[in-house]
Amino acid sequence: MGAFHATTIFAIRHNGASAMAGDGQVTFGNAVVMKHTAKKVRRLFQGNVLAGFAGSVADAFTLFEMFEGKLEQWNGNLPRAAVELAKEWRSDKVLRRLEAMLIVMDKQHLLLVSGTGEVIEPDDGMLAIGSGGQYALAAGRALKKYAGGSMTAKEIAKAALEIAADICVYTNGHIIVEEL
């Protein structure tokens, strides 16, 4: 789901609830952990939208600001704001160099937004990005399939990140989960 290292973000829509989880590790290069408690999942648009990023922190903050502006411009219409962000991100010569990916969600939609112009809504209500993304996605799918009836979206998101943190050296166990 992406070649960006040093983070894992997982999001799920399950049984009418939405949750997004991210780890707290910031890695400098390939060898040094600079921070253990970064917050990579944010609430936007009066708390009605969750956004998580993988990639360069400075680039992600630029994209968060731009995306929040698009949400304001389109009165909280998440799909429209995501498409407009992707169009601008892809067409602008400076923005095109930003190295990050976003997962954004509200109570109705879950979307992956990238700088190459993709806006993807998953079929199964789950997305993951970052170096531990594949591990978290596999764990989330298994948890939903085999324990989904007894677990909430928040519980699945947290457990998926815990499993990814056990496997991926760029993902730590300081997990922040936000839910809608």
Curated annotation (Swiss-Prot):
Chief localization: cytoplasm
Organism: Geobacillus kaustophilus (strain HTA426)
Gene Ontology MF annotations: metal ion binding; threonine-type endopeptidase activity
Role of this protein: Protease subunit of a proteasome-like degradation complex believed to be a general protein degrading machinery.
Gene responsible for this protein: hslV
InterPro entries: ATP-dep_Prtase_HsIV_su, Ntn_hydrolases_N, Proteasome_sua/b, Proteasome_suB-type
Name of the molecule in the record: ATP-dependent protease subunit HslV
Family to which the UniProt record says this protein belongs: Belongs to the peptidase T1B family. HslV subfamily.
Regulation of its function: Allosterically activated by HslU binding.
UniProt keywords, alphabetically: Allosteric enzyme, Cytoplasm, Hydrolase, Metal-binding, Protease, Sodium, Threonine protease
Single GO biological process annotation from the record: proteolysis involved in protein catabolic process
Compartments where found: Cytoplasm
Assembly: A double ring-shaped homohexamer of HslV is capped on each side by a ring-shaped HslU homohexamer. The assembly of the HslU/HslV complex is dependent on binding of ATP.
Catalytic activity: ATP-dependent cleavage of peptide bonds with broad specificity
Residues given in the record as Na(+) binding sites: A165, C168, T171
Active site residues per record: T7
GO CC annotations, alphabetized: HslUV protease complex; proteasome core complex
E.C. designation(s): 3.4.25.2
One Pfam family matching this protein: Proteasome
